[in-house]
Amino acid sequence: MMTEKALPESLTCRISSGFFLSPALHVFNPDTDYALGDGGRFYTPPRIVSRMRRELALFPATYATPGDMILLLDDISRDEMENSPYLAVMEAKRIKAVPLAGLQGLAHSVRSIAPWGWNATLLRILEENNAPATLLPSPERIAGLRELSHRRTTVAFHRLAPTIMPQCASPVPVELTSEDEVMDFCNRNPGCWLKAPWSSSGRGVMHTDDLEERHIRPWARGIIRRQGSVMGEVDRGRKLDFATEWM
């Protein structure tokens, strides 16, 4: 019987109760929030986001398990790979980078596909490159994940928080579905915040302090046309800006 000591170092962490665990296939797609906002299967991200996806393609190596793989959504040259700040950790963990063209050959080699975030465009790309259907979520699952990512989800949290921690009571966000509703909310709550249902990196957020109606209406009109609504939040005089990533 093969013992753990007889295995290559990169595989020893994959022994659990006597079973070998196949590697996970990671995908870095930081454009996922934009793609969720678009909702379609043929979304093209802004150039700056596409560049970030390309430059940080090996970033999953920082949290991947030794022996895992990374799927490259872009054609990355050898020089780009060698200049990546994550190459060293990738080599230390013996993580393999796989181009899209090599996806079909992984049908029996990986246990899961783990993107930065699922969306309809990524699902189409993986399907077109013959990813194993058993590793892909259904279109219905993608639609469900998109709804969970909508900012209206925070309404339930705002209502629940005070029942658990009374000191955390705060004004509940309001979903606004027309320009007139947006302006009425702004007039009743000077200096309020307006937020697109789906956005990323601070984009899609407007602080209305010192802004006139002629600035607010066009912005709200565009968001409502593309995403169906705008979320309104009362300004609370913030003390600190921060964000968290859940892995």
PLM segments and residue spans:
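Generic beta-sheet signal
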Residues: 24-26, 113, 192-194, 230
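Short loop/turn segments at strand-loop or loop-helix junctions that form parts
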Residues: 26-39, 74-75, 117-120, 197
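N-terminal-proximal low-complexity accessory segments that begin disordered
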Residues: 7-62
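Conserved N-proximal alpha/beta basic substrate-recognition cap immediately N-terminal to
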Residues: 49-63, 71-184, 200
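Phosphate-binding site of ATP-dependent enzymes
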Residues: 190, 213-247
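Glycine-rich phosphate-binding loop of ATP-grasp-fold ATP-dependent ligases
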Residues: 172-173, 191-216, 243
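Flexible loop/turn segments at secondary-structure boundaries
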Residues: 34-35, 78-81, 200-203, 239-241
